Amino acid sequence: MVLIALVFGPLPAYSHSQHGDVGNSPKSKKDLLRIGATVYKHMCVFCHGQDGNGGGDAMAYLFPWPRDFRKGVFKYRSTPFGSLPLDKDIYRTITRGVPGTAMPAWRGALSEDETWGVVEYIKSFSKRFTKDKPKEQIALGEVPVTDSESIKRGQSIYQEMRCSRCHGSDLKGDGPIAADLYDIWDHRVFIYDLTDPNAFKFGFDKKDLFLIMTTGIDGTPMKSYNHLNDNERWDLASFVESKINKEIYKPAQYESDLNTHVIDGEIDTDPENPLWNSVAVQNIHTLPLNARRDPIDQIQFQSVINDEGIAFRLQWEDAQPDRTSSRHQDFKDAVAMQFALGKVMLHKHGHNEPFFGMGNRNKVVNIW
């Protein structure tokens, strides 16, 4: 799919990543709550809602739906099944985002104090954090070497544990009961393709796989497999890791400066114009609004500018054509570009920029 757009006046854009490191903040809890409330109301409320119920204005367009923080149930943790997460677990999710969903990585957009502030503010939505304490972090120990024997043992365990009922015999997420699964919020569960490294929400290294098998994913049908001994879980992790096509992993920077190429000639809207052959291509990592097979997770960006206007050429791979749409909530094959208007400082802390999901009141955007 190739699309070219011609507009007047260059403006910046940015994309999101999956990377982040756990830090710390010396500020008091009171100060962090104040900071976190400000950030949450500017950056998070549109999806997660005013009271953290996951019912923000953007919810209708998203699947999976945003997390409801009020129950105090968190999917991705380093603590045992049923336990509250550690603060650093929530921090990790905020900074790294949740691949395969609309939850972006906020590292680079938020300072450490702001991120820790959001951690504290999220915890304030659930009474569990005032009544309970997180259990101790699961100790991983030394990661054993993967060999053909451990993979073979892991495959046997995969079959014995009937993992294929959900994940499919080839780990593509098409098991016989995959379409009939729901979480505790009564939301339908989407089973991702485990051969795709871009679909893993908590990491796809062997230690990450071992950890998720040990903790389970709270609130979902994915239970903990801690009834297996450590060696069995490591073998199962070896088998799953052996099926991951790591060559198709597409890392991205949190924010990308998108550059335009100055030309002297005229600009037309023909995407096959030879002028594009000499224009550098930049890759933008995209976030799917709705989980689906073969999502569009990367767009190739090019731009040229002259004295009269600016043009963009965008290309992406899409195996299934969708040229028409009969419902407003469905989308045909197309692309939209969003430009912040007014005096906006992107790439700066302070959050002067509009909400990236089509802007917000008093901070409008121009959408092409």
Segments predicted by a language model, with ranges:
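Extracytoplasmic electron-transfer domains, predominantly the class I c-type cytochrome c fold
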Residues: A60-R107, E112-K123, D180-L228, R233-V240, ...
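Extended surface/linker regions that mediate inter-domain or inter-protein docking
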Residues: W106-R153, S169, F239, E317, ...
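Electrostatic cytochrome c docking/interface patches
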Residues: S15-V39, F129-Q159, Y254-S256
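N-terminal pre-domain segments of enzymes
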Residues: H16-S28, I248-W276
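Accessory recognition modules or surfaces
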Residues: L11-L32, V45-K71
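Bacterial N-terminal signal peptides
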Residues: M1-G9
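Sequence/structural segment immediately N-terminal to covalent heme-attachment motifs in c-type
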Residues: K30-G49, T146-K172, A178-I184, L236
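Surface-exposed, glycine/proline- and aromatic-rich loop segments on solvent-exposed faces
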Residues: N283-W368
